[in-house]
Amino acid sequence: MAELTNYKDAASNRHLRFKLQSLSRRLDELEEATKNLQRAEDELLDLQDKVIQAEGSDSSTLAEIEVLRQRVLKIEGKDEEIKRAEDLCHTMKEKLEEEENLTRELKSEIERLQKRMVDLEKLEEALSRSKNECSQLCLSLNEERNLTKKISSELEMLRVKVKELESSEDRLDKTEQSLVSELEKLKSLTLSFVNERKYLNEKEKENEKIIKELTQKLEQNKKMNRDHMRNASTFLERNDLRIEDGISSTLSSKESKRKGSLDYLKQVENETRDKSENEKNRNQEDNKVKDLNQEIEKLKTQIKHFESLEEELKKMRAKNNDLQDNYLTELNRNRSLASQLEEIKLQVRKQKELGNGDIEGEDAFLLGRGRHERTKLKGHGSEASVSKHTSRELSPQHKRERLRNREFALSNEHYSLSSKQASSPVFTNKRAAKASNMGMGTDSGTQETKRTEDRFAPGSSHSEGKRGREQPSVLSRYPPAAQEHTKVWKGAPKPGTESGLKGKVEKTTRTFSDSTHVSVPNDIVGKGDKTSDLSSEAHCGKRGQVPGHASQGTQAVESSCSKAIGALSSSQKASSEGLSKGKKTANGLAADANFSNSKAPILSKYPYSSRSQENILQGFSLPNKEGVDQPVAVVMEDSSQHEALRCRVIKSSGREKPDSDDDLDIESFVTAKLVNTTITPEPEPKPQPNSREKVKSRGGTRTALFENDKNAAIENDSVKPTRPSSNAIEFPDANCAGVKNQRPFSPREALRSRAIIKPVIIDKDVKKIMGGSGTEVVLEKQKSTSKSVTSKVTSSITIYPSDSSGPRAVPSEAPRERHTSTSNIQVGPPELTAISNHVSSPLELSIHKHDITLQLTEAERVGDGSPKNRAEMVVSRSSILIKPSESVEKNSHVPPAETIRWKSHSASSDSRHITVRNAWKSKRDLKCSEDPPTGIGRNMEATNAYTQRPCTDFLELEQPRSQPSEQGARRVGNSGDAPELSPRRTQSSLTASEVLTRRDRMGGAITAASCNHSSSMEEGEDSTFVTSRRIHNPLEHSELPGKQGLPEPEPVWTEERLHPAKPYAEED
């Protein structure tokens, strides 16, 4: 080591020595440079001194020197001119000498050229002579060539003539042989044609017999089925008639063709016979050859004709077989329809027998079994008869009718369940599609005037229209028992092709989907899983459930979705019909949301049928403080091809008064058929509402129904209006009774009014939470663990702040618009509660509505006064996919992460893949930072533990939280081609102004604007639907009461995605 260190030291010392030497050298160089610089400076200074001295002394000598210089320059200039002249002289001499030499050379060249000229002249003379000789030789050659050509052409002509003669001899030999053979063939062909003619005549006779038998069978079938056709389905008669017409037309046309072909054959044979006789008389071979060729051609045409006749016979046999099959299927259909008619008649008789019974066990029956209000078929017979139904208060008879309706609904549901077990969903779908397609081309105009059509397939169950025709009693128009009655009218949708509908005056078919109203008991309402108990109790749900959903759980889920006030008022009267008679539905096919899955393929074959399927508008009407209800103006803007629908509803606000009764969860859900009416009614004064008529503030959101009966008030407690003119649909609380339909306007006003309504789907959840002093703690616990599934709604939503029409409304508030295009929003739900067991399952809700318009106007006023809010939602044809994310840690109160995924599945060229972030423009003044999320998860418990987990927190503390509404879980049936009924209730923006009178209660009213309709998607197609969503200005916020600060309502995020037509099978 020491050596290494020494070596390193030595090396470093050397290096330092070299550096010192180099630095010393540089210093020496620098010193020398400084010395040189100093010397130069000294010399410069000396020179400067000398110059200064010389300038002072030599000025005179310099002037003399300049004069001398000028003289010298002049002398030098003269010398230069002399030198130039001498140079010029020398050059001139040289040039002259050169020119003399050139002239001598030119002379010599001229002499040479002259000699050559003489030689060339001699050559030219010789060339001219030779040219003359050559020209003579060329002429002689050309003459010889022409002669040789003539001779060769003559030789070729002779050769061709010889060949022609030889070929003609050969041809004559061949033609003689061919004529002999063809004559033999003709003899054999004539024999075969005679045999075939006999065979064809026999076949014709057999076919005529078959045709006669078929016509006799069809006539017998018509006679057998006339009674059934009159009562149940005239479209079957029309199909039979069309079948008969098709048979007769095709058979007659083919008989005529056959007869014409046989006549032609006879003529051809006569001609051939005549020609054969003439041939015997003729002796010239050429004529015989021509005739034989013509006969051969004619016989070939005959052969082709016979082949075509054989093909036609084969086709006729196939068509006869098809007609026989169709005949058998029609017989089976007629039998099934007859059996169904008998069952319906028996059920109607049972209902009529039950009409005299008591109604005492109604409440227990409703709570135990669930409430099943069924939509009824209403015939469009005459406007006067319909107007009788329009305004009615409830009477004891109507109470009995409601009880009968419920029992009939239960019996129908048992029938549907048995039919579901009996038939597989694919089979029922195919059979229903086949049965429905037979009547697609039928005349919708005459059908509507004749009768109401019972609309149900074997797998589905629909309520009948006979009870819809029952005339209300006189007592029904008076208020004492008015709150008990719910009357839902459903116009029978008439199948028909679009072309069939174009030429016809079509009465408006209005279908209001099954409105199953379930009132929740108070003990259930207090719990966090109110709707789950309801869904488990009301096991029957909607009757139009998909056959594929064999499990009770999905039925309960659908029932919980459809449990809502669906009663569009029965006062959708003749005025709305009569004014809309000229109005054609955009699609020939309008179908219920309640059609069972087996009947949905009818809709799926018509891509635009969904526009007219359901118009759902749920309205809550609140009586004014002064007792006067403001007019409702609904203006529908009809865009081309029903692509976009905009509806503006202006409703007056009413003062709400809290009632002392317990709150109930009211899920209001209405589906309405396409109603073509424009309503411009005039206000009618309403009397002062009595104490029971006070509307709960929680259910106070009002939307205008698109009918003459536009105002509907959902009242949680039993409400007794004093006048039938109060336009409200009210839910009584005490007896869990249904909706009361009232006439807002006189029939004259209704006749004057018009409303053109395109498909509207509104699903409202009005959630009432029973309040007490002790519920606040429970509420916070539930808020921390609240879960709600984000509703993925494919829709176009336009939300405007409503026009301020109330006395305390802010008049100068201008509506702000905000367009947000969203699609496929998936929000992860918060953690599961430690108490309840949740099964995370994907849900798919498919919406096939082309246009959905929602309008919300809040009539409630807080103490300071707040503007009414109007939400307008246009939902285009779409599919909704709700997939709750996997369950996360229990007991964790962290708000859920929000994941937004945009999916755009489309085969169309203009499909767009859009990603839009959550950008909601909302007022922050109502935001309470200390408030936990107010969403209260409502656990849905189905019988098969198929539960839906709600998710509430959309934006954690950045945006006001929306109240979670009940999420409807929908399962897609196993059948691939069957569109599903997708009733569900989704989250919606909470109107905070409703909180005025609920300071002592903890829950917030929730209006869920959701799209609930049957998704009649394309059946076997992979066609996808492009859906767009526009979100206009979110609802404006009103001030909260002092004690309870409800967070500001947040519009529901909805999903827009291009969804393939086939539904997905969901996991349980």
Swiss-Prot record:
One of its GO terms (cellular component) is dendrite. Residues 510-519, 984-994 have a biased composition (Polar residues). Predominantly expressed in the brain (at protein level). It comes from Mus musculus. Residues 834-884 are annotated as: Required for interaction with FLNA. The gene is Luzp1. The keyword Transcription regulation does not apply. Residues 251-292, 375-402, 432-558, 677-700, 782-829, 924-945, 959-995, 1033-1068 are annotated as: Disordered. Residues 11-354 form a coiled coil. This is Leucine zipper protein 1. Residues 785-796 have a biased composition (Low complexity). The modification Phosphoserine is found at residues 256, 261, 395, 513, 571, 575, 612, 660, 691, 746, 906, 988. PANTHER family: FILAMIN/GPBP-INTERACTING PROTEIN (PTHR23166), LEUCINE ZIPPER PROTEIN 1 (PTHR23166:SF7).
